[in-house]
C-alpha cells in the first residue's frame, strides 16, 4: 500500500475521528493567531500585484474537521481587520482559499461545513456569499500545487514533520533492521538512523521551500507552525509513548518483534536551529519572525486548561482522563498507518497501553510539545528591487 494512502487523519465524525479529537490543535491556532495577524498586516502593506482585488491564500496540510475552517476564519478576520486599520474597509478584496492535503483526506466532511461557515461570515463579518471562495486542492506539498507566482499567502500548521517517505538505509545490506525496537528517529536510535531521518527531512523541507517560492509572488508571505525538538524537562513525547505501547505488546507476545522492527513512521521533529539553517541555505526566503512555545500534550482536555503551567497542581489529579484524551488525539492521527501495518484488531490495545503510559507522565507534571512558529517572506527578484 502506498504511503500517501494511509498517511492521513481519521475522517468522518465518529468518536475516533480527527474532527472529534482536535481541541489541542485549536489551542495551537489560538497561540499563532497574533502572529498570523501581523503576517497579514505586512503582506497587505507590501502592495503585491492584484492583492487589493483578490488575495489568494492556501492552507497546506489542512486535514479535516472544524479546525480546517477555523484557520480560514482567522485569516479572513485578520485581512478585514488590517484593511480597516488601513482605512480601506470599503475596498475589502475577494479572498480565494485553497485547502490542500493528500488525496485520502476527508475533504467531503469539510465541504459539509461550508454553508454554515459562509452564513457566519456574512452575519459576523458582513462578507456576502462570493466574497470568500473556498476550494480543495488535493496533492502533496512536497511537489508543486499552484501555478508559478500565483499565491499571496501560504499557511501550514502541524504538517511539516511528516516526511514524503520512510527514509532509506534503515535496513543493512545483510537485511538487518538498523532501528530495532524503535518506530522513528528517537534519542535511542543509532546515529545512522538519526542521520537517515535528518537527511530525508532536509531533502523534503528544502523541496517544500523551493516549491513554495515558485508559487508565491515576490514578497509573498508564508507562516509555518510545527513541532520542534524540546528538552529533557518536557518528558517523553507522544511518539515515545506510542513506541512504548507497541513494545509492551511485543513483550506480551501480542505482536511479533519482526513486525515492530519493520515499522518506521515517516516523521521527523527538527530542532529550531535545523529549520533556521535549512531556510537560510535554500535561500528563497527571509525569516521575519521566529518563536517557540510549549504546550502540554493534554492541553485542550478542558476549556479551563492553563496549557503552559509546569506544576503538580490539582489539574493533574485526573491524569487518567487526560491521558485517555491524549490517546484519542494520537489515535485520530496515526490509526490509518498503524492499522495498515499491524492490523485493525490490535489498535484498541495499542492505545489502551499508550494511555496508561501517558498517565504516568502527566502525573509527574511532564509531557510537553515544543512548538515553532516561523514567518517568512519570499525574497524579491533583483528586477523587483
From Swiss-Prot:
According to UniProt, this protein's pathway is:
Alkaloid biosynthesis
Spell out the coiled coil positions from the record.
Answer: none
* A Pfam family annotated for this UniProt entry: Methyltransf_7
Task: Indicate which residues the UniProt annotation says bind Mg(2+).
Answer: 179, 261, 263-264
Residues at which S-adenosyl-L-homocysteine binds: 18, 62, 67, 101-102, 140-141
So where does caffeine get bound? 158, 161-162, 238, 369
Give the species this sequence originates from.
Coffea arabica
**Protein name in the entry:** Probable caffeine synthase 4
Tissue specificity annotation: Expressed in roots, stems, young and old leaves.
Enzyme class label: transferase
Residue numbers for the site described as Involved in substrate discrimination?
155, 267, 344
Q: Which family does it belong to?
A: Belongs to the methyltransferase superfamily. Type-7 methyltransferase family.
Q: Which UniProt keywords apply?
A: Alkaloid metabolism, Magnesium, Metal-binding, Methyltransferase, S-adenosyl-L-methionine, Transferase
> Which co-factors does it depend on?
Mg(2+)
| Gene Ontology biological process terms in this record | alkaloid metabolic process; methylation
